[in-house]
Amino acid sequence: VAASSALPTTSSGTTAGAAGAPGVPEPARQHTKAGAIAFAEHYIGLINSVGQEPKVGVLEPLALASCKSCDNFEGTIKYFVAHKQRFDGPQYKIKKSNVTGYSEIATFIRVEASEPAVSIVAASGSNVKRYPEVLKSVSIFRLDWRSGWRVVTIQGES
């Protein structure tokens, strides 16, 4: 790649035009279709990680306060922290993701995943509840760009 075709970087070393909440990986900070896909996949990855190692405040900066599905994920984590519980594995394994709509107003990402069998476990290691495997789960993310991607809604595909 010629030096003239490289994107300019800021003094912090991030690509010019990149934005987003702290901790969001570089590909998910781009205001592009690929950036939107990377952001939706990053959000699912965080759901998996905070489900297994619960920590409040990780998901909240990535979504609008009006996102009801996001509130549900955040509420589960708050409950886990308060009751010293966690998932014993990831809740989602992404199979494929693609853009289904892209405009200046909103971007829609379709994420197809499987849901492995997973248990909620107590600090003692005892099983609290077991969820069966779901082979196909499809979620439609509506993302808006507001100095970085933010989740507006997550809906199941009917």
Describe every region a protein language model picked out.
Residues 16-87:
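Core segments of small alpha/beta cavity-forming domains
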Residues 1, 101-158:
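Exposed beta-sheet edge and beta->alpha loop/turn motif
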Residues 82-100:
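A short, amphipathic edge element
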